[in-house]
Swiss-Prot record:
Spans within the Cytoplasmic topological domain: 1-32, 95-106, 163-169, 261-291, 349-352, 415-424, 488-525
Transmembrane segments: 33-62, 74-94, 107-126, 138-162, 170-201, 227-260, 292-318, 330-348, 353-374, 378-414, 425-451, 464-487
GO MF annotations, alphabetized: lysophospholipid:sodium symporter activity; symporter activity
Disulfide bonds: C205-C458
Glycosylation sites: N216, N225
Organism ancestry: Eukaryota, Metazoa, Chordata, Craniata, Vertebrata
CC annotations in GO: endoplasmic reticulum membrane; plasma membrane
Species annotation: Xenopus tropicalis (Western clawed frog)
Protein name as annotated: Sodium-dependent lysophosphatidylcholine symporter 1
Keywords for this protein: Cell membrane, Disulfide bond, Endoplasmic reticulum, Glycoprotein, Lipid transport, Membrane, Symport, Transmembrane, Transmembrane helix, Transport
The reaction(s) this protein catalyses: a 1-acyl-sn-glycero-3-phosphocholine(in) + Na(+)(in) = a 1-acyl-sn-glycero-3-phosphocholine(out) + Na(+)(out); 1-(4Z,7Z,10Z,13Z,16Z,19Z-docosahexaenoyl)-sn-glycero-3-phosphocholine(in) + Na(+)(in) = 1-(4Z,7Z,10Z,13Z,16Z,19Z-docosahexaenoyl)-sn-glycero-3-phosphocholine(out) + Na(+)(out); 1-(9Z-octadecenoyl)-sn-glycero-3-phosphocholine(in) + Na(+)(in) = 1-(9Z-octadecenoyl)-sn-glycero-3-phosphocholine(out) + Na(+)(out); 1-hexadecanoyl-sn-glycero-3-phosphocholine(in) + Na(+)(in) = 1-hexadecanoyl-sn-glycero-3-phosphocholine(out) + Na(+)(out)
Region entry Disordered, spans: 1-29
InterPro entries to which the protein is assigned, alphabetical: MFS_2, MFS_trans_sf
Length: 525
């Protein structure tokens, strides 16, 4: 049945070639992707970023201070969840690449069927169950891993969809720019919804902690009414659930818009071959492509740097800087700055090239990270650093997704008989970044445990503040510099990219001529 469906889909696509206004009829590439289609495609990127930003900024502090999971076990949850998430990416990518074409396409059905289960599991991540101990750890670990699996079933096909919304590289680059703008806007929404709803609640802290027992924190709260403390903590937990519900509603809405507003286009050169390949064959081909390895290695280091920032910035602002009541607003400024500067970086990479944009964009945050750690606590300075960090975050968001299609085009030219590997390219990039995220969260939370982090304390020991400074400044700066050094080896510059574009255009035109001749011969017979 799958083969019959695939043949029918292929025949349908070939049958459309004589229709007026079809993409094949326009060999000069005049049929550009509409702005509406680009916007609908871009909106599909919001759910992953909204949920990812909320989890990245707030899950650690939620587990530590609201669910009151001890730091060691919180590190296990965060690390295991992200590593599991990383493992599922290449597996989902492989299964997506083996999917047969349907009326919706090959990729969009994954979006449709994963969405309802993803939103339920996301809600349960932010729910504090009525039990404690190992059962609570298992609860968060199961639903965190389940959500990461389901959101992967959404995001990997969506990422691969970049290659199938248009045959024109300029359209794909433009759509990527739209997508990055919406995705960074999604991080603003995630930060705003989670931060502002939760930030309205005054989560109580404990001035003096005498002793803490595993899963059953025993504290002496001086000058703090215990009844008020319990009620306030309960209202904070409710606020987290309300924020999760709002985010889930946006998730579903974005999935509907993506499904209804975007149509997959099966590329002309892909129709020439549908030879089956195993997971290991596809993986071997992809991982032997040197430009891809160099690209993802460079972004692995820079992504790890920004994930360390994301995972620890809220704790740094709350405890080291002392901005307990302002941290959600500072995070919001970071994301707003990133959103507003994505169009600038889109223009910059078009004008000066993508490698140049990498060097300028990602390195721009370094002096401000050093400044915020060396200077005394200053709210105005914190907002200045937030704006500068947003500028660099925008570049870090845009550039990988803008450069991956160039690597895939280069792969297609060097492996003309191998098709359908696009999901593996995207999924393995996401695999490495998520693995880096798991490592960063696990190491940072474990480091805080070793430094003596005190759950719900109003202030932390000096060792904890020093650890947060290392996680916010020293480690990210070193990782960014290593990543930028590796980008020197990346071979696809602007000249090479333009050569690949011309070569692919010639292949597509040749294939269209061949298809047209075959159809004409068949009609004559």
């Amino acid at each position: 049945m799958e083969k019959e469906s695939e043949n029918a889909s292929c025949a349908g696509l070939l049958g459309q070639k004589n229709e007026p206004g079809s993409p094949t009829q326009s060999r000069s590439g005049k049929h550009k992707l509409s702005v509406c289609s680009k916007i609908c495609f871009a909106i599909g990127g919001a759910p992953y970023q909204i949920t990812g930003c909320a989890l990245g900024f707030f899950l650690q502090i939620f587990l530590l201070d609201i669910a009151q999971v001890p730091p060691f076990y919180a590190s296990i949850i965060l690390f295991s969840g992200r590593v599991w998430d990383a493992i599922t990416d290449p597996l989902v990518g492989f299964f997506v690449s083996k999917s047969s074409w349907t009326r919706l396409g090959r990729l969009l059905p994954w979006v449709v069927f994963s969405t309802p289960f993803a939103v339920v599991s996301y809600l349960l991540i932010w729910f504090v169950p009525g039990f404690s101990g190992v059962s609570m750890v298992i609860w968060y670990l199961v639903f965190y891993c389940l959500f990461q699996t389901l959101v992967t079933c959404f995001h990997v096909p969506y990422s691969a969809l970049t290659m199938f919304i248009s045959k024109e590289q300029s359209d794909r680059d433009s759509a990527t720019g739209y997508r990055m703008t919406v995705e960074v806007l999604g991080t603003v929404l995630g930060t705003a919804i989670q931060g502002q709803i939760v930030g309205r609640e005054n989560t109580p802290c404990v001035e003096h902690i005498r002793e803490t027992h595993l899963y059953n924190t025993s504290v002496i709260m001086e000058d703090l009414n215990i009844t008020h403390d319990v009620e306030s903590l309960s209202s904070t937990r409710d606020a987290y659930m309300i924020a999760a519900g709002v985010i889930c509603a946006i998730y579903v809405l974005c999935a509907i818009i993506l499904t209804l507003g975007v149509r997959e286009k099966r590329d002309a050169y892909e129709l020439l071959s549908d030879q089956p390949f195993s997971f290991w064959q596809g993986l071997k081909l992809v991982m032997s492509h040197k430009p891809y390895i160099k690209l993802i290695t460079g972004f692995l280091f820079t992504s790890l740097a920004f994930m360390l920032l994301e995972g620890n910035f809220a704790l740094f602002l709350t405890y080291t800087m002392g901005f307990r009541r302002d941290f959600q607003n500072i995070l919001l400024v970071v994301m707003l700055s990133a959103t507003l500067t994505v169009p600038f970086w889109q223009w910059f990479l078009t004008r000066f090239g993508k490698k140049t944009a990498v060097y300028f964009g990602i390195s721009s945050v370094i002096p401000f990270l050093i400044l915020v750690v060396l200077m005394e606590s200053n709210l105005i300075l914190a907002y200045v650093v937030a704006v500068a960090a947003g500028l660099s975050v925008a570049a870090a968001f845009l550039l990988p997704w803008s450069m991956l299609p160039d690597v895939i085009d280069d792969f297609i030219l060097k492996n003309p008989d191998s098709h359908g590997h696009e999901p593996i390219f995207f999924s393995f990039y996401v695999f490495f970044t998520k693995f880096a995220s798991g490592v960063s969260l696990g190491i940072s939370t474990l480091s805080l445990d070793f430094a003596g982090y005190q759950t719900r304390a109003c202030s932390q020991p000096e060792q904890v503040n020093l650890t947060l400074k290392m996680l916010i400044c020293v480690a990210p700066v070193i990782l960014i510099l290593l990543g930028l050094l590796l980008f020197i080896l990346y071979p696809i510059n602007e000249e090479k990219r333009k050569q690949n574009k011309k070569a692919l255009q010639l292949i597509r035109e040749s294939n269209r001529d061949s298809d047209s001749d075959s159809l004409e011969l068949a009609s004559n017979v």
